[in-house]
Amino acid sequence: MTMHVEVGPDSTAPPHSSGIKVIIIGLGIGGLAAAIECHRKGHSVIAFDKAQELKPVGDGIALAHNAVRVIEKWGKGTVGQELGRLSSRLNTTVIYDQTGRFIAEDKLDGFKAGEGHLLPRGELSQVMYKHAKSLGIDMRLASEVDEYWEDENSAGVIVDGEKITADCVVACDGVNSKARRHIIGYEPELRSSGSCVFRGWMTTEEPLVGSHWLLSHTDQADQVKVFAGDGVHVLLSTIQHGKMVFWLCTHKDNDCYDRKKEAPPTPEVDGMIHLIRDWPMRGQIESTIRKTLAKNVMHYPLLIREALSNWRSKGGRMVIIGDAAHPFLPVSGQGAAQAIEDAAVLAITLHLAGKEEVPLALHALEKIRLPRTALLQRSSLELERFWLNIDWPEVEKCPELLTIPRPKWIHGHDCQTHAYTEFAKVVSAIQMREEYHPLGGPRDSTNGESLLALLRQDT
């Protein structure tokens, strides 16, 4: 009996109907999304993570509309509804200078209710993990991969001495990926972006004395406030109607990465306060972040890699996605979203190519996804540098320069419809060994046009 399987961006397939077995390494946001999306398209999934358990910890994470439109299809909409209950209720980000003078309002397009989410990172991963378990996906924790291998017909891993065989291996093990070298054959250079970041979070179960300026009116909407100075900017945000406060401070530091090789930066609030010691707004900001427990403070260099030219192994049956392939700076607000886009497109290209053409599916995934992520990587670095080298006379003329560009080609992107639309064109380009020109996105940069200008293209 032939099983009819609907094909389209909203379609699902019966479990295990494709005959394709996928091994997923890493159960962060990207890995969980890959497991769920592959299951939805009828692929058999076995996933591994070295963690003993997936703990519901972490600070805030932004999930933009281009990712939420994927998640909203899970569990007949129930997963999206649950995230909506956990998410902040955002209206605007208010931007000030270091004296507290109002500069501009950012309308947060793509993150408002019904569009995107700002929520605790740990709770997002827990909701995704719970949904994956409800689907019966085989997920194995406390599992360390010892070896990666592939041949003409299969690929797999050796985990704790056991050889696991599949049609392909998908590594989603983060920016410090151990799989990456085995898959693409080398370890790309990691270098400093020229800046470091302090991050911290706290709950408001105990009253935060001196924080009324941030917590007032959170019964109506959560608050996001940004303070911009010379070489330093600070963001404070409430989450879940003021139940949690998340903050970060990004600052110039060209030597932070080199010092980290000798000793990690000290993750102390004092270090962050020192950066704003001369700010008129210091007292107000300090009154809130002083409540952060030491265990909830991080301080680390913001590292970058040049966009990779290839995500696949030589044999074509192993691939890296998410932060393992394209780490983003926090200012982009797209790290999680791009990992989820990768996951959705992976499941679709495998579905369309079929079991006999798995290497072609992974090649098509790379062709569709790599140009978009490479452009976003480069533009996020330019955006970060703009914020740390603010041209105040220009901002005086146009305060909107300090708002974060959120063009339709990023936040309005439907990665699933795009994959179905482009798949045949991509396959033809691969088979004919021709250059593939992606549909959609910004115009190519010409006449010295900056990447930041491309970000402001609302196409």
From Swiss-Prot:
<feature type="active site">
    <location>
        <position position="199"/>
    </location>
</feature>
<dbReference type="InterPro" id="IPR050493">
    <property type="entry name" value="FAD-dep_Monooxygenase_BioMet"/>
</dbReference>
<dbReference type="GO" id="GO:0004497">
    <property type="term" value="F:monooxygenase activity"/>
</dbReference>
<feature type="binding site">
    <location>
        <position position="121"/>
    </location>
    <ligand>
        <name>FAD</name>
    </ligand>
</feature>
<keyword id="KW-0274">FAD</keyword>
<keyword id="KW-0560">Oxidoreductase</keyword>
<feature type="binding site">
    <location>
        <position position="336"/>
    </location>
    <ligand>
        <name>FAD</name>
    </ligand>
</feature>
<dbReference type="InterPro" id="IPR002938">
    <property type="entry name" value="FAD-bd"/>
</dbReference>
<keyword id="KW-0521">NADP</keyword>
<feature type="binding site">
    <location>
        <position position="323"/>
    </location>
    <ligand>
        <name>FAD</name>
    </ligand>
</feature>
<dbReference type="InterPro" id="IPR036188">
    <property type="entry name" value="FAD/NAD-bd_sf"/>
</dbReference>
<keyword id="KW-0503">Monooxygenase</keyword>
<keyword id="KW-0285">Flavoprotein</keyword>
<protein>
    <recommendedName>
        <fullName>Asperlicin C monooxygenase</fullName>
        <ecNumber>1.14.13.216</ecNumber>
    </recommendedName>
</protein>
<dbReference type="GO" id="GO:0071949">
    <property type="term" value="F:FAD binding"/>
</dbReference>
<keyword id="KW-0520">NAD</keyword>
<dbReference type="Pfam" id="PF01494">
    <property type="entry name" value="FAD_binding_3"/>
</dbReference>
<comment type="similarity">
    <text>Belongs to the paxM FAD-dependent monooxygenase family.</text>
</comment>
<comment type="function">
    <text>Catalyzes the conversion of asperlicin A to form asperlicin E, a potent cholecystokinin receptor CCK(A) antagonist.</text>
</comment>
<feature type="binding site">
    <location>
        <position position="62"/>
    </location>
    <ligand>
        <name>FAD</name>
    </ligand>
</feature>
<feature type="binding site">
    <location>
        <position position="49"/>
    </location>
    <ligand>
        <name>FAD</name>
    </ligand>
</feature>
